[in-house]
Amino acid sequence: MTNTRKSHPLIKIVNHSFIDLPTPSNISTWWNFGSLLGVCLGLQILTGLFLAMHYIADTTTAFSSVTHICRDVNYGWLIRYMHANGASMFFIFLYFHIGRGIYYGSYTFMDTWNIGILLLFAVMATAFMGYVLPWGQMSFWGATVITNLLSAIPYIGPTLVEWIWGGFSVDKATLTRFFALHFILPFIITAMVMIHLLFLHETGSNNPSGMNSDSDKIPFHPYYTIKDILGVLFMMITLTSLVMFTPDLLGDPDNYTPANPLNTPPHIKPEWYFLFAYAILRSIPNKLGGVLALAFSILILTLFPILHSSKQRSMSFRPLSQCLMWMLVANLLILTWIGGQPVEHPFITIGQLASMTYFFTILILMPSTALMENKLLKW
């Protein structure tokens, strides 16, 4: 008698993806972030759905509806803060996941990597639009500043901005379309995640050694299902602690003031997870140059497979490249800090130096160090 798990047309797909999937026996905790991102996405869709039941996408009532959710809806405060801090967790895991991919050379799976970059853009767009919805001061001014950047595009820029706004400023039309897009994008992201996994399962997972692991594979269940559940447990402990004790730790106090087009906040800044890109944007005095640098700071990820010049895939056995990798991490932390600081001396100079180092490390230092390590291997 055939096993239903292996013969049923639908269950068979789940079986090949999560149960009988041959997985390298030596993948570390750095491989947990994929499943954690999946859990985060599910959590965001669920909490977002309940928030959408009470939220009103209108400039006059949006702020009040969020207040109503927190005060009057049963456990509304919990749903709202789980959603807001869940986004922060999402980005923490995203950055760890990308960092893992860079460190262990997972970007050599070109299809999986490129879909991943598109996913990153989609998640960033979703998070940005979600930040606009509470219609606080930082929501309004953040939306105004970031959408205005598109006006730097030659010839079509100003028209494009007005087209996105649905008028001559960020107003009711903007809020309505941002809510519609914020609602639909997570489902598009879910479809993209499936494509991401489809491409991954074509090649199989990478592993810390960066070598072919076909000779040493184990089934995904029970070994990695248990490991993933442990990761989810740690994530839920962290997230619930954040929500229960310091729900506003990662937010901006300005967003507790209703949006006022006549009053500009002293320091306009996005959520913490965009600060590194915001710092790169601000470090260039020219508007178009800043926008290009901002776009390229993320698009540079597409160059990793092209710039890979080492004979080894992973950085596990390459100490010099490891130093550069951690230098890049430190550099991104500095950029994140700078993005949250006012535009004044010495922050301007630090931001410019950190932005320059970011591009220099990825484009020149990392490939040349890899070539040097190839030479050292021959000695």
Curated annotation (Swiss-Prot):
Binding-site residues for a ubiquinone, renumbered to this chain: H201
Membrane topology: Multi-pass membrane protein
Cofactor note: Binds 2 heme b groups non-covalently.
GO cellular component terms given for this protein: mitochondrial inner membrane; respiratory chain complex III
Transmembrane segments annotated in the record for this chain: 33-53, 77-98, 113-133, 178-198, 226-246, 288-308, 320-340, 347-367
Pfam families reported in the protein's UniProt record: Cytochrom_B_C (PF00032), Cytochrome_B (PF00033)
UniProt-annotated location(s): Mitochondrion inner membrane
Annotated GO MF terms: metal ion binding; ubiquinol-cytochrome-c reductase activity
Biological process terms in GO annotation: mitochondrial electron transport, ubiquinol to cytochrome c
Cofactor requirement: heme b
Binding site for heme b b566: H97, H196
Residues annotated for heme b b562 binding in this entry: H83, H182
CDD domains referenced in this protein's UniProt entry, alphabetically: cytochrome_b_C, Cytochrome_b_N
Annotated keywords: Electron transport, Heme, Iron, Membrane, Metal-binding, Mitochondrion, Mitochondrion inner membrane, Respiratory chain, Transmembrane, Transmembrane helix, Transport, Ubiquinone
Subunit note: The cytochrome bc1 complex contains 11 subunits: 3 respiratory subunits (MT-CYB, CYC1 and UQCRFS1), 2 core proteins (UQCRC1 and UQCRC2) and 6 low-molecular weight proteins (UQCRH/QCR6, UQCRB/QCR7, UQCRQ/QCR8, UQCR10/QCR9, UQCR11/QCR10 and a cleavage product of UQCRFS1). This cytochrome bc1 complex then forms a dimer.
Entry function: Component of the ubiquinol-cytochrome c reductase complex (complex III or cytochrome b-c1 complex) that is part of the mitochondrial respiratory chain. The b-c1 complex mediates electron transfer from ubiquinol to cytochrome c. Contributes to the generation of a proton gradient across the mitochondrial membrane that is then used for ATP synthesis.
Miscellaneous information on this protein: Heme 1 (or BL or b562) is low-potential and absorbs at about 562 nm, and heme 2 (or BH or b566) is high-potential and absorbs at about 566 nm.
Record family assignment: Belongs to the cytochrome b family.
Name of the protein in its database record: Cytochrome b
Species: Ctenomys steinbachi
